Amino acid sequence: MLSSRGGGALYDIGCYCIHASRYAFGALPKRVVGLIERDPKFGTDRLTSAILDFPGGQAIFTCSTQLVPYQRVHFLGTKGRIEIEIPFNAPRDRPTRMFLDETGDIFGSGIVTEAFDTADQYTMQGDAFSRAVLEGGEVPVPLEDAIANMAVIEAVFQSAARGEWVTL
């Protein structure tokens, strides 16, 4: 994939990290800082890390197209933590799991595990969009959400290029 055609870690994977962070905080970040390593052959970002500074805290993520596959979301708070296993492209052959730890025990005793039924989430998204179009209803996620996510993505690219925080 050539950079002139799009693609790369941030567009293809990091978009989900940004969306999950925006959803968790219920807001756009105030500012972002990013660091990008580009593939010398294709020019796309193959490794991207960013800090998103929200009014209520920070989100940090790393995404890559060329590292060993690993996918988790961790929410860390003052009273506990949540970990979601393979949240963005859930496997079809086993459930995605969420781990809730409200004990604060560093060894993880008392973690509650919840398994979600297997599903083809991309088909479900397409079906929901089709129903909204065919039946004249609202789409599950409005266009404004995609525009907001893209603003954050572009800010991460700008930050990496300039080597400084970018305010949204």
Predicted segments with their positions:
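NAD(P)-dinucleotide binding in Rossmann-like oxidoreductases
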Residues: 38-45, 54-124, 142
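Conserved loop-to-helix N-cap of the C-terminal "lid" that shapes the substrate pocket in Rossmann-like
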Residues: 10-14, 119, 140-146
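Residue-level detector of beta-strand structural context in well-folded domains
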Residues: 9, 48-50, 71-73, 157, ...
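C-terminal helix-rich "cap/oligomerization" subdomain common to oxidoreductases
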Residues: 128-168
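Anionic-ligand binding region
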Residues: 34, 45-50
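Predominantly a Rossmann-like dinucleotide-binding segment in NAD(P)-dependent oxidoreductases
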Residues: 1-41, 163
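A broad structural signal for alpha-helix termini and local helix breaks/kinks
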Residues: 24-25, 54, 133
